[in-house]
Amino acid sequence: MKAIIAGGRIPRYHQYADKMSPKEYIEGVKRREIHDPTLSFQISNDFQVKLVSKNYLPEDNESMGYATILVWHNIYYEPDQSLLHSRKSYVRIGCVQWQVRPYAKMEDLMESVEYFVDAVSDYESDFILFPELFNTPLMGSFNHLPAVQAIRELAKFTPDLVEAFSKLAISYNVNIIGGSMPMIEDDELYNTSYFFHRNGKIDFSHKIHITPSEEYEWAMKGGDKVSIIETDVGKIGILICYDVEFPELGRILADQGMQILFVPFLTDTQNAYNRVRFCAQARAVENECFVAIAGNVGNLPKIANMDLQFAQAAVLTPSDFQFPVNGIKAEATPNTEMIIISDVDLSLLVELHNYGSVQNLKDRRKDLYEVKLKPAVKKPGTEAQNNGI
């Protein structure tokens, strides 16, 4: 059953008819300033008053002839779907805690990537998340160059890496969040996360907020698009490392229907990691979504700006009775190369949105404040570009 539509009496309205209109009476019942034996019961069971009908029952003197037209929506209703188009409730996520080590060639790096993709796909995972700038070991060949030139040399690998990742997503039937890679667009350098659909489609998102180190060492620029990605199992968002520390971005994605937020990160110290971790946990609570984070571990002593790494991958949840008491669904051992795999139940988010102990999204005071994305400013001489490839 999808919904119930009903007409209802307001039997105590006759006691207030000389003081207020039917609509004012109904608002008083909603605020619990007035108790109506019929309407109070209906409202407490999530019936919503859509309109007031006059002369619905003229002989109902207690209701003064008025009646409410109410609607009750069944949040558990699922329309019949063919097996080809149905979406499952449980989604399996794999996070790679990636050990940085020297690689002489791109092929050597991709051999390690394929190992993890193969391992995660063996568990029939829907997603695999790699860390931010996981491919920086390839910069070792450019140690003789200034950092700002070395990172641009690294960006030259990106087109080939994108092609290789896309083939893996198709071959192993798993959606891949390819961490992030440097990308050159219109001669500007961006920190870009690619999403490789297992059907062959590719989406990408630029990092919005560039850290002082990225700007000073590498002259990176921030992107200007924030949008969810529709996948075969749900709606996801990607925020790269520092971006998760800005709650506005998570809220914009939540308003677009995001169910899972993926955060590839790169942090050098435990302090930096905790900033990402604590903010990721907050995004899960305030946006009523799951959050998966994954970072690099180990050391790259001969590569400028990449010498230290600290990480602890995790899958985080909202905080309510349906979820783990500490909001942690799965967690890696700190600073150890490994994979974590966890199932998340998207149907629990629907339950939380409607019946949670608190309802952060629903209870916002939109009469007082709002968070919205401004239109992207188009660069002179360029056309607006889509997120997809």
Regions found by a protein language model. Give the residues of each.
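Short hydrophobic/aromatic beta-strand or adjacent loop that forms the aromatic wall/cage
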Residues: 64-70, 190, 224-226, 308-311, ...
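Terminal substrate-recognition subdomain of acyl/acetyltransferases
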Residues: 2-89
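Cys-nucleophile CN-hydrolase/nitrilase-fold catalytic domain and related Cys-dependent amidase chemistry
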Residues: 106-198, 267-282, 286
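Short beta-strand segments enriched in small/hydrophobic residues
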Residues: 86-100
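C-terminal beta-strand edge segments of enzyme domains
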Residues: 297-389
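Active-site catalytic loop in hydrolytic enzyme cores
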Residues: 167, 183-260, 269-282, 358
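Short hydrophobic alpha-helix segments
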Residues: 53, 199, 205-206, 327-333
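CN hydrolase (nitrilase-like) catalytic-core segments centered on the catalytic cysteine
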Residues: 155-177, 245-337
